[in-house]
Amino acid sequence: MKDSDAAKSPSSLLWGVFGAGGHHHRHNGKASSTHFWSTRDCKPYFLFHRFFVFLLFLLLLYFFYTYSLLSSPLPSCDGVAVVRLSNFTAAVANRTEVRSSPSTPALAAPRPQSTATELQHIVFGIAASAKLWEKRKAYIKVWWRPRQMRGFVWLDKFVKEMKAKDPALPVLKISGDTSRFPYTHRKGDRSALRISRIVSETFRLGLPNVRWFVMGDDDTVFLPDNLARVLSRFDHRQPYYIGSLSESHLQNIFFSYSMAYGGGGFAISAPLAASLARVQDRCLRRYPALYGSDDRIQACMAELGVPLTRHPGFHQYDVYGDLLGLLTAHPVAPLVSLHHLDVVQPLFPGETQAAALRRIFAGPVRLDSAGVIQQSICYVTARLWSVSVSWGFAVTVVRGVMSPREMEMPTRTFLNWYRRADYTAYAFNTRPVARNPCQKPYVYYLASARYDNATRTTVTEYALRRETRPTCRWRMADPSALVDRIVVYKKPDPGLWDRAPRRNCCRVLPAAKERKKRMAMEVGTCRESEISELGKQ
């Protein structure tokens, strides 16, 4: 075969690559000449041969290594490589490191949950005036707990208690001078400037371990435990401004629907109080035409970009008259504060307001503050009576069957702030006082409260208020003729507001034969499928 033919033959080419390797071989019994690709003209074929051999070597090495790896036992999970892999995986999944060297900062871990807010974490700032101090201080003594709470009463002038300290009161202080701030409202009073700075002045005292600053007036009555319960539901490390509106629609229009009314009280978290203290003096100069203190605070909150967080337990009570309709249909929320107690009628007829408050605080508030004034609705089926229990305050009985939808709506036993009987002037739903003399409610006010250690139950008694009533022609049992007192049994439930909001249920108990003219009832958490309806007896 000729060299040119060999170059064109595929079999010759393959043999050369896999066998000859560029050496001489025998052909037809004779020694052939030097192989064709060793010549100068076939240099590319020589390079291809070397490269192909190198790839073949790598391929064999790869198969050998893979076979050795698969045939060997798996490494233990305690190996260093596995630990490092686990650390990386945990860091990606949880954004935290399981293990880190001292020289390497760990990834940021979630902040631990703080403990529940307690009274020790709250500082009160109470606005007061020397002119009304002698009367208003009695309200503060009702709810203040000297050894459990921290706070200050900020006055405009010196009062005698500053010299001879009263241990039943908070520390008394004189507010700072505000004459440098402009005030141009024609009908207002410059004291609004002083009062608006109470939170900032209290913050600057530098008290330790403060989570919340709570503002109120000297005629504001707080329920401290309920206040702590409410504030515990918020993260005190965030900027919060918590309070409620006026009951008067016109008041909210004149001032703001975004403002917490100071008389009802409001709470400012510590970080927000710090921000307010830094900017408030500059802020006050920009609003000389505002009327009061609370609208000035809201103006500064607007500049800080913090909205009002509303809570229905703070009560401004911009109303006149009797609070019965409001208190017997309280929202399903803890009662936090009461205000304008000098303006409205005493909570219990025939008593001073301070005495009425002391009765509630000495009994129901002490026994079960979470349930105070909470409404329960049930029916006396045999007599067709509708019953509403405002626990710790009053029980109302109405002849006839009223739906829960009606009974949870406040009766207008009060007038709005502008002394008009206009139901459109309220910022909530109300219902009129019954015109039918037969449907005028019978009111049983709190008479006593105690705790039964044997049954671990609170026992509250409510006595009928005797009054002249119009003639009723209904052939239906008269509650005043059959029931003088109503006894309500209720187990304390401090965790009431840790659950989803729901009215408690009440149940009429069988009457004891030896106790005539008494009706016994039970109030507590609703049972499964229990609703307020006229049942069978």
Name each model feature, range by range.
Residues 212, 253-267:
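A recurrent flexible, glycine/aromatic-enriched loop bordering the glycosyltransferase active site
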